[in-house]
C-alpha cells in the first residue's frame, strides 16, 4: 500500500544512533504529487484503451450484497501494536459488510469499505467473470484492514489492526465473486 511502502516521500523520519531525524522536502512534495498523478493517469489511459464493448446496446448494471463476517476486538491505541509471535485475537460480534458493483460490457467496478490486501484484490480480479475488474476500497466509507488468513497466522500488522476476524476476507471474496457471477448472468 502507498501509505506503507510509498514510491517517494516528501516527509520522512529516520533514526540515527537513537535520535529521530525528520526530513521535509517541502516544495518538492508538490512535484512528487504531480509525478505520481501523471503516472496514475497514464495507467488509467492504458487500461481504458483496452476496454471494449462487445454489444453496443449494453446496460449499466448495479449490484449490491450485504453479509456478515467474523469480528474481532481491535486495539484502539496503535502505539500498543507491535510484532509478537502469537498475538491474542479476541472474537467480537459479527460485522455487516457490503460489496457493491457497477458493470458495463466487459468492465466491472467492485467497491468495498474495508482496505483489502493485494492477495484479495488479485484473487478477485483473477476469478472475476469480467475481462476487466477494478477493485476499489474504502467505498461509501472506510472500515480498516481486512486481512487474509495468512496475515492472522503470521501475526501481520493488518490482522492486528483490524476489526475483522480470521476468515472475513475469504468470505468477502466469495460473496463478491458470487455477485459478479449473478450480474454477468
Question: Which positions does each model-derived feature cover?
Answer:
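Non-catalytic substrate/cofactor recognition surfaces at enzyme active-site rims
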Residues: 1-185
Amino acid at each position: 500500500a502507498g501509505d506503507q511502502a510509498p514510491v517517494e516521500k516528501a516527509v520522512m523520519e529516520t533514526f540515527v544512533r537513537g535520535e529521530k531525524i525528520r526530513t521535509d522536502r517541502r516544495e518538492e512534495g508538490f512535484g512528487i504529487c504531480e509525478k505520481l498523478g501523471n503516472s496514475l493517469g497514464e495507467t488509467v489511459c492504458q487500461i481504458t484503451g483496452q476496454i471494449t464493448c462487445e454489444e453496443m446496446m449494453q446496460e449499466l448494471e448495479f449490484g449490491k450484497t450485504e453479509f456478515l463476517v467474523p469480528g474481532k476486538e481491535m486495539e484502539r491505541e496503535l502505539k500498543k501494536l507491535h510484532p509478537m509471535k502469537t498475538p491474542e485475537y479476541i472474537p467480537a460480534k459479527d460485522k455487516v459488510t457490503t460489496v457493491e458493483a457497477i458493470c458495463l460490457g466487459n468492465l466491472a467496478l467492485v467497491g468495498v469499505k474495508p482496505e483489502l490486501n493485494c492477495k484479495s484484490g488479485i484473487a478477485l480480479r483473477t476469478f472475476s467473470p469480467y475481462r476487466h475488474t477494478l477493485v476499489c476500497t474504502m467505498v461509501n466509507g472506510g472500515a480498516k484492514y481486512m486481512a487474509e488468513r495468512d496475515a492472522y497466522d503470521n501475526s501481520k500488522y493488518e490482522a492486528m489492526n483490524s476489526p475483522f476476524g480470521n476468515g472475513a476476507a475469504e468470505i468477502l471474496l466469495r460473496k463478491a465473486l458470487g455477485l459478479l457471477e449473478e450480474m454477468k448472468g
